[in-house]
């Protein structure tokens, strides 16, 4: 974990911290706080991130998600309160997005293979070969928890989880919205587009900065190959991440209908060209 406190500008002392977790670099910027307060806030946020990584990283054999993936096809598994809440939320979002947001993998048929029992808080897979991947949900979920913690202390901060999930609390210290840029997938150091954020979140889905796709088609089970990035802004980091994932997986003709069900959210297609240009299409 890295922590730097700068008083180079005495009118706006600023704390910066970075933590590598959840397969990415998480960063936080805290202007106008005393150093001791900034350290406490930072550690609170990083504890949330570490705990989420410990619990929901499917590549950790001892995570609750890995245990669920190994056993739920054989027996109903009791889930703790937070895990069950996450699974219920993901099922709600699956239905609200026409199935294009789906945490289940290993199933190439569009039926429900995940069975949740709210009476017993148990989870069961009704067919073998199924497993769950919360990678398209947990960053937004934890980021939203972190925003609540930070906003209880300060009205000015920027949190970035891997640059693909960003939340701005208040405005930039200079008064304007925070300028948050999306990296161009073909040109290192070049922005594909910049979004002004103030009390809002941004989520971006699509190819990573190396030009690789990572989202699974919920119908076929194959990795999707698409050229565009999808950027979503709105009040909730969790919902923005769900929407960017779902809209990127959905056919272009269905994106508008999906987005219309979520008040307060906007979406853009970023068509990044190999010559460095970007065409921006608002949905």
Q: Which residues fall in each region the model found?
A:
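Mature catalytic core of soluble alpha/beta enzymes
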Residues: 1-283
């Amino acid at each position: 974990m890295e922590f730097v406190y700068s008083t180079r500008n005495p009118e706006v002392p600023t704390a910066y911290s970075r933590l590598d977790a959840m397969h990415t670099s998480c960063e936080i910027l805290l202007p106008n706080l005393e150093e001791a307060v900034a350290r406490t806030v930072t550690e609170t946020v990083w504890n949330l991130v570490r705990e989420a990584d410990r619990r929901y990283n499917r590549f950790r054999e001892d995570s609750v998600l890995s245990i669920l993936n190994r056993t739920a096809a054989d027996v109903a598994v009791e889930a703790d309160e937070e895990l069950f809440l996450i699974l219920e939320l993901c099922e709600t979002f699956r239905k609200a997005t026409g199935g294009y947001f789906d945490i289940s993998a290993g199933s190439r048929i569009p039926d429900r293979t995940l069975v949740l029992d709210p009476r017993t808080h148990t989870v069961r897979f009704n067919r073998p070969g199924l497993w769950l991947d919360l990678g398209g949900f947990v960053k937004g979920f934890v980021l939203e928890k972190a925003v609540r913690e930070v906003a209880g202390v300060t009205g000015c901060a920027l949190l970035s989880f891997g640059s693909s999930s960003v939340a701005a609390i208040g405005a930039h210290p200079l008064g304007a919205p925070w300028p948050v840029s999306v990296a161009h997938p073909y040109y290192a150091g070049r922005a594909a587009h910049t979004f002004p954020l103030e009390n809002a979140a941004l989520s971006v889905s699509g190819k990573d900065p190396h030009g690789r796709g990572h989202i699974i088609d919920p119908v076929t089970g194959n990795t999707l190959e698409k050229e565009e990035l999808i950027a979503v802004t709105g009040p909730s980091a969790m919902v923005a991440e769900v929407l960017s994932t779902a809209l990127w997986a959905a056919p272009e003709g269905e994106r508008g209908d999906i987005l219309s069900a979520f008040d307060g959210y906007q979406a853009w297609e970023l068509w990044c060209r190999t010559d460095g240009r970007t065409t921006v299409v608002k949905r």
